[in-house]
A protein has these predicted regions:
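N-terminal Rossmann-like NAD(P)+-binding domain of SDR-like oxidoreductases, especially those catalyzing
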Residues: 1-176
Length: 176
């Protein structure tokens, strides 16, 4: 049975992703600190599934994050973890920037250490917000980053840190 470690899986997108994969033969560990917008109530059925485990945890400690990864031994890591409310990021930018950048960097660091033992991929979930507002058409991956809020700037920063980890440490962080 494959094992997926999911960070931030209690938000809107993470919940829907877990709903989808929980029907497959995949063992799931969801790590989430449960913020104000988390949707844990929306998947009470999943909580009862034998292939699903939830662990309430704040990703602020890179060493503890590594211990969780190392003990679970995932085949893939999917990082949804981020505070994502644009308006709240405008009223409290320091919290958003600090939380999103530090949490993702801690995940990348822990992944880098685990990657030395087992070559797995980490899928870092980004947002179209990193490209800013388009007057016409939609954004594509090669577009220039043009964040328009502290939230989107924090996500753009984590994307760039992921790219730097790949270049510096030869890891396989995929930005989606």
């Amino acid at each position: 049975m494959k094992k997926f470690l999911i960070t931030g899986g209690s938000g809107f997108i993470g919940t829907n992703f877990i709903n989808l994969i929980s029907k497959k033969n995949i063992k799931i560990l969801n790590i989430d600190k449960i913020s104000k917008i988390s949707t844990l109530e929306k998947y009470k059925k999943i909580l009862k599934k034998k292939n699903y485990t939830f662990k309430k945890y704040n990703l602020s400690d890179k060493n503890k994050t590594y211990k969780i990864i190392n003990s679970f031994k995932p085949d893939a890591i999917i990082n949804f973890a981020a505070e994502s409310h644009v308006d709240r990021s405008i009223s409290d930018p320091i919290y958003f920037i600090s939380n999103n950048i530090n949490s993702s960097t801690n995940i990348f660091f822990a992944y880098k250490e685990y990657y030395k033992k087992k070559k797995i991929k980490l899928y870092h979930i980004s947002t179209d917000e990193v490209y800013g507002s388009k007057k016409k058409g939609s954004s594509v991956e090669n577009d220039k980053y043009d964040p328009s809020s502290p939230y989107s700037a924090s996500k753009a920063s984590t994307d760039l840190i992921a790219k730097a980890f790949n270049r510096t440490y030869n890891t396989e962080i995929k930005i989606l």
